[in-house]
C-alpha cells in the first residue's frame, strides 16, 4: 500500500463531503461557513461521542490483548501510537490557535482568542482518522473492503460541522494530522508505546503450541 496515496485518499474523502458554498472571508482554506444546526438522526452529538470513545477503547483493548507478534496485534499497536500522538498534537494546537467554534462566533477567521476556545483542529476527527489509517494501510490491498473504514472520519467530519462544533477547515486539518501520524506509525518496524512496556507489551491470555 502506497502510504502517501492512502493519506491523500483519506483527506479527499473528508474534503469531498463539502458542497460548494459561499465562504466567509478570513478563514484558512477559504471554505469555512456555518451550517444550520442539526443534532438529529445520525448526526446526534451522542453518536459522535460514542464513535470516538468506542474506537479509543477498541484500540487500547486490541493493543493490550492481541498478540503483539501477529499482524493484527502489530496493527493495533500502530493505531495506539497514532491515536496518542495525534491527541498530543491536536491538544497543543488547540491551545496555540485558540479558535472559536461556530457555536461561539459566526466569524471563522477569529483565532487567538485565549483560553477556552479549542475549535482548531478537530481532535475527534483526528482521532478517528488516526485509528483507521494503519488498518487501511495494512489490509487495504488484501481486503479492499477495509477501505470502508474511511467512511468513519468522513462521517465524523460532517457530524462535527453540522452540530456547529467545528469549521470545515478544523475537520480537514484534523484528518490530515490523524492520517500523517497513522502513516508514520504504520511505517515503524516496532511500536512506540507498547514497545516501552515490559516483555514488549501486555498480551493477556494464553497460547498453545503443539
Where are these regions (language model features)?
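Interfacial segments of alpha-helical transmembrane regions
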Residues: 62-88
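Hydrophobic alpha-helical transmembrane segments
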Residues: 48-65
